[in-house]
Amino acid sequence: MWSFPIPFWGLWTNYLDKPVPVALMSAASQDSKYKFIPKHLRKQMKECVMSYCYASVRDEDTQKMFSYITDGQCCPPVTPDPVFAFNQNAASLLPSKADIMKRYGLSDNYLLVSFKNDKRSMVSQTWLNELQNIATQHGVQCVSLPFSTSRSAGELDKEICLPLSPVDWYALLKYSCGYIGNNMHPIVVCIHNAVPFFSFDNYGTKHANGLFCDSSTSKIRHILKVADLLDCRVASNSLFRHTPTPSHVFDKLQTFDRDKCVSFAQVYLKKYNEMMVTIFERIGCDSH
């Protein structure tokens, strides 16, 4: 349940002839119910955490987890997901928009839609049909974007099929006119490329066998709260969730505040670079 031990915890360093420094960058607890971790296991986790030369986390919930399992001795800073620096670090890997449009048969204005095949995460086919009709009236092509191991739920006129390389996946989001769906990393890509989005947030700590969900632990909610973009999100993983209408969601895309995204992305890129400088200093490497 708590994934211990795995390489994440750095126990493998005990088997090396010469110790190496271990840094933990923008870690996330994935909505772990860490307060139920047995005391003996928490003690082992604490020893691992305190041996890191650097640790940072991706959200406030993970920060609280680290503080809890270390009895307050480690309260790591919240730092950006590394994907926020993709354009800085790997823009040369991206194909052009013209190439993406040609290979995937896309129009100049396409909207990506991606829902997990889970009744607590997805929307109905009727909802998708209405969204597609609205988009078509505005000259926008609706396109189904798959997950890494499965296709998106529902049917649209156009679908991106698997296999799909990570670089093409990123480029598809970067060049789109919008994204609607689940998961965090599409939102991260949209934010730092100022692409309009609406998140059906499927993260959070579930209670009462999934009847209720505490979305305060959501990684998406944390990012959008900091970016002041919570109006582009709805919690989607509770049985009692409220599903916004397709017209409401499409209107949110049309009135999306791109300037706010640009400003936030610049702040987060600066924080990312500061984090990397600190990591290199701690592990004794030259950051240049």
PLM region spans:
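Active-site anion-handling motifs in enzyme catalytic cores
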Residues: 1-288
